[in-house]
Amino acid sequence: MGSDWDEIKRLAADFQKAQLTSTLQQLSERNCVEIVALLLEKQLLDVVFTNDGKEYITPDHLEREIQDELYTNGGRANLVEVSKTLNVDLSRIETLAERIAEENPQIHLILGQLIDEDYISHIAQEINEKLALRGEISISDLASQFDLPSDFLQHQVVEKHLGKTIKGRQDSTNPRVFFTQAYIQRCKAKIRGALNAITRPTNVATILQQINVQEKIFHSLLDEISPAGQVTSKLSNAQYVPHIYAKTQSEWVQSFFKQNGFIEYEAINKLGISDPKSYILKQLPQEELYFLKRIALQQRLVDLTVVTALNECNATKQYLDLSTILPSNLSVEDIEEVFHTLTSGPKQSHLSTLVYLDGIVFSQPYLNELIQPCQELALSQGKSAIDSGIYQQYIVDKTLAQKGGNASNQLDDDEDGKPDKRDERRKKAASGKAGGGAQGRETKTKSTKKHQRGRAAAAQHSDDDDDDFQRGGGGGGSNKKSVKPLDLVKCEDVVKLIFPVLEEEGIEHLAKPIAKLYLQQLNQSALAKAQELYEATPQTNRRQTHASIQERINTLLVDIRLYEKGLKLLPQDTQAQLVKYLLKSLGNEICNELALYVASECNLTVKNNNLNVDQRNKLAQECDAQYRAVLVEQNKALNKSIDDFELATESVLKVCSMIIKKVDKKKDRLLIADHKQKLQQQLLENQEPALILHLAALILFTSISGCILHASGKFVSSILQYIRGSLDDQQNALLISYHDLVLKVLQASPESAESKLAHEQLQGLQSKVVELAQNFSRASVSKAD
């Protein structure tokens, strides 16, 4: 080992000698590289190579060069830039920079940068200048300006030099904000001046916008200023309420309440107070109040005025307008709430009989006297309901609806019980025949006027439902249907009776509310009267219904017999069509009359009085056994001959205990003459060409044949053909021409020239056709004899 060291010393001496000698005696570059490599290999030398490997330097010298770079850059050097400048690897620079920062407390390594105290003092001076200029500064602004960490700036720069280089103070609520004392004084002066100038509640945001002060400084300085007012909160929507405004609010509320005895919540809301009830309690602690929906009302005012007046009204037959004794500012809703608040209290329970309507209170005796005439109306309406049969139908519907709710699991029991009920009805029917043949309750029927001599209108009630009737009593599984209440007394009738009395008092606008108030009571009185009359005269009404139906059926049968006599004069093929038309019209009407009568006898309710064949067959299946077969057979006879239909009808009448009147030929002639007269009257009243031709043909047929005919418009040609031989050529030509023009009008377009021309020609012939039908005499016709 010693020999090696001696050899090294010798080489070093040679190296030094070579450097001091002339060029011819220096070592070559290769020898130098070998010598350095050997020293590095023996770890006797520590050097740092440059990035290109052509140069090397010792760590100590590199450290001095880094410090020189730090000084050259003004106390702040980026290690990346130093690495580029010294041409040394960045890792070696970072390692040495860390050692420099550890060994020298005046130098800091921050985010890849070396910073010394001189630079920190320099930026502290800059911060002080900026703070003096702006009055307030934050660490975040400094961090973005100097590109340094905020914690380093706060602790190593600002706080370290605060009060020395940096003349200012730190915000106690936000340590990252610093400001000068002069700035604080300016802000205080601005805030104090703004708050002193405000006379009404103002948003803090508006104040800050005007004085250009930050919100956090405003709230931190507010307690130091101690303004004559208060801030509602520290939120963004906070308001400043000056003391003078709060005092004015309090004085206004107390003054208004003292003068009026009440105060509206809306008025307090307009003052900027969000909880009016709490504010009223705070401002009027000694007052006893009624807190209503819209107002607070003084209890003493109500006791002295309203309660006294209500007691007086209750004791007399009078009414009281509350709006005349309560403050005029109160609405109708407020007055109603006051009344209900008073009458619902236990102390004023004796006032519960009073009736309130639209601001006016009525005593019960006053209303009883007012409504007394309506009681007579109710009794009259009850009697009318019995006379018209409305109440009887209502009783039937109500009974069926109550029975129709039986459960489907009781179907067998109901079916087993039906024969007993039917036997009972048969017994009642047997007893009823002695008194005229009526068996069931009365139901509304059509008028007894004859067809084409004033037929009744269609039935009053109709329903689109296929099930137009409902079995009363034991229909198992049927749904329970509610019956609409029967209103015998109408609101309009009650108003008409009480209106004159109320009009004299100037309160006629309450006529309808009072009528609605007593309408149910009056209807109950009317129903009670109807029930009384119904129970008193059931048999009489049933006999009248039975007789009415019997007369109606006989009238229709006479019509059919007379029409049959007339249609037999026409050709055989036309006769068949006319028979079918006759049965579909008058025959169908007879079937309906009898089906409805039987339905009432069997306690069935029928919603639609205008029944078709299927509905009548379905209804027949619901009837008692004694009616079922004859009704079905009568329905089938509508598609047969007139004789078959008459026989089937006689069977139904026999079961219903009705009789058919004998033929009276003298009366037949009167009926034919009456029928012709009515046709002539209709002819004079009509202006429709087709109807005029139809009526004229029927009148001429009756005049010529002495018979009446039931035919629709499509049979006009056949009728004209029949009467042709009884007319002269001119009369035939007139009717044929009029007939052709009618066909032309019906076939042509209404707006066409052809149609208009035909109309004009018809107008010219109309009077002649009417005159022919009116004045034609059978005596002048040889064929008629």
Swiss-Prot record:
Organism: Drosophila willistoni (Fruit fly)
Enzyme Commission identifier(s): 2.3.2.-
Name of this chain's protein: E3 UFM1-protein ligase 1 homolog
Annotated GO MF terms: UFM1 ligase activity
Function statement: E3 UFM1-protein ligase that mediates ufmylation of target proteins.
GO CC annotation terms, alphabetical: endoplasmic reticulum membrane
GO biological process, one term: protein K69-linked ufmylation
Claim: Transferase is one of the keywords in the record: yes
Region of interest: Disordered: 404-483
Recorded family membership: Belongs to the UFL1 family.
UniProt-listed InterPro entries: Ufl1, Ufl1-like_C, Ufl1_dom, Ufl1_N
Enzyme class, spelled out: transferase
Superkingdom classification of source: Eukaryota
Keyword vocabulary terms for this entry: Transferase, Ubl conjugation pathway
Pfam families xrefs: E3_UFM1_ligase, UFL1, UFL1_C
